[in-house]
């Protein structure tokens, strides 16, 4: 839940987020829609604990997000190649995450031999599957998907979104989905918020 979030990139400049509040239930898939530059990604970074708001607060079950250890709010980034350590094999990257079971890998179509490769050796769609697996650790309660499929072909997009809808429903994980595509949000989300 976010309460009265205010954020500006520079003091005295127009705020990117001006007293934004929202809440997401554990079974909801909430779409965030808005043009470029309206603060969608900034809000998602704040909700996932990557960025601090100038004022306002983010909390889970009435408490602030943890400052260390595993965060139950996980973010999947737009550019998977920037989210993975290029010096680790993808198998090593998965081991850094929170208990990823093989069924999750199978559901995402992750081939066992991909885990011996490095991020630069896989396609964007293959790499995004690893980013999703890392974000879906056993302790994840909320998932933030920030334009995660815009660079993918339509078949891969469909596979990934269908998997995410099934997995988040099965595990009662709340999901925030950022997209410029209203059609995508209409298909995936239970409700939408326009910034």
Where are the model-predicted features located?
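The feature captures the beta-strand-to-loop junction immediately N-terminal to the Walker
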Residues: 33-35
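Conserved ABC transporter NBD signature motif
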Residues: 56-69, 100
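Conserved ABC ATPase signature
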Residues: 118-122, 126
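Hydrophobic anchor residue at the start of the ABC signature
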Residues: 132, 144, 160
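Conserved structural motif at the start of ABC-family nucleotide-binding domains
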Residues: 16-17
């Amino acid at each position: 839940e976010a309460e009265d979030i205010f954020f500006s990139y520079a003091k005295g400049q127009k705020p990117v987020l001006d007293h934004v509040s929202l809440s997401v239930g554990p079974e909801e898939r909430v779409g965030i829609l808005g043009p470029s530059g309206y603060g969608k990604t900034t809000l998602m970074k704040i909700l996932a604990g990557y960025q601090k708001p100038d004022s306002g607060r983010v909390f889970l079950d009435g408490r602030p997000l943890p400052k260390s250890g595993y965060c139950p709010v996980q973010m999947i980034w737009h550019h998977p190649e920037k989210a993975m350590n290029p010096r680790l094999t993808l198998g090593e990257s998965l081991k850094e995450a929170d208990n990823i079971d093989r069924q999750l890998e199978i559901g995402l179509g992750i081939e066992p031999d991909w885990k011996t490769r490095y991020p630069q050796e896989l396609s964007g769609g293959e790499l995004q599957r690893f980013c999703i697996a890392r974000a879906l650790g056993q302790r994840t309660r909320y998932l933030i998907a920030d334009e995660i499929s815009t660079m993918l072909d339509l078949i891969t997009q469909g596979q990934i979104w269908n998997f995410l809808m099934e997995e988040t429903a099965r595990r009662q994980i709340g999901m925030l989905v950022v997209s410029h595509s209203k059609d995508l949000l209409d298909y995936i989300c239970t409700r939408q918020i326009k910034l």
